[in-house]
Amino acid sequence: MTHLFEGVGVALTTPFTNNKINIEALKTHVNFLLENNAQAIIVNGTTAESPTLTTDEKERILKTVIDLVDKRVPVIAGTGTNDTEKSIQASIQAKALGADAIMLITPYYNKTNQRGLVKHFEAIADAVKLPVVLYNVPSRTNMTIEPETVEILSQHPYIVALKDATNDFEYLEEVKKRIDTNSFALYSGNDDNVVEYYQRGGQGVISVIANVIPKEFQALYDAQQSGLDIQDQFKPIGTLLSALSVDINPIPIKALTSYLGFGNYELRLPLVSLEDTDTKVLREAYDTFKAGENE
């Protein structure tokens, strides 16, 4: 059985100070993740505010992370757009910088049909020849990769995984029927459903909350793999996730990454920070979670 990673991959935030990338904060954050058992780092995805990053900024962030990680865990670059040729060029550059894999979101706004999805993803995979994680997030794109399409794409030698942010277990089961899970990984894109996702055979999660609790979130996966019932272990994490759901990702998680010292609490427009009262409640929820660990 060979997968890109198993367990927790972290959808990395982008730290800003005065609207500029804070490279030192980025390095501090990545070191924290590596020291706390993150199994992969996903760069320039939704949580990174990729729509408001310039090409130069994306490349600088990716290069910084790749150099720091130094092959200890896979670094996966978000390079997908709704333009196939632009996605190819971004993916080729990510490969040149040393990325271990790329993550490709479904085309949004202009969208396409299922045949178009196959051609889009295969064209990028053929051009780049680097492992590809498909990213299905219909809540953001209004477009889904149907299970039949996943089946077709899973036959491609470089298309090796799906980030499944549908939060739909019927979808998961339909996909599972059609793929070889020994060679094609299924990663949840929803932190709050990981208990059942793991129970149903998922290989891991591409996580937001793991930006601040990577060790605890990986321990949950490890416990499940050991045959333990993880419902009770998940409960305090679930409480923190409920607090995190106060607004759209990555607005709340950056209230916590900044609390831990990974840059200021800044986002780029059109995203705005939480109201002060919500920020306080969320940070108190994090403190309560950490205090519970020490009891």
Curated annotation (Swiss-Prot):
Keywords: Amino-acid biosynthesis, Cytoplasm, Diaminopimelate biosynthesis, Lyase, Lysine biosynthesis, Schiff base. The keyword Amino-acid biosynthesis applies. SUPFAM superfamilies: Aldolase. GO terms for cellular component: cytosol. Pfam families: DHDPS. InterPro entries: Aldolase_TIM, DapA, DapA-like, Schiff_base-form_aldolases_AS. The record marks 46, 109 as: Part of a proton relay during catalysis. It is found in: Cytoplasm. Its EC number is 4.3.3.7. The active site is at 135 (proton donor/acceptor), 163 (schiff-base intermediate with substrate). This is 4-hydroxy-tetrahydrodipicolinate synthase. The lineage of its organism: Bacteria, Bacillati, Bacillota, Bacilli, Bacillales.
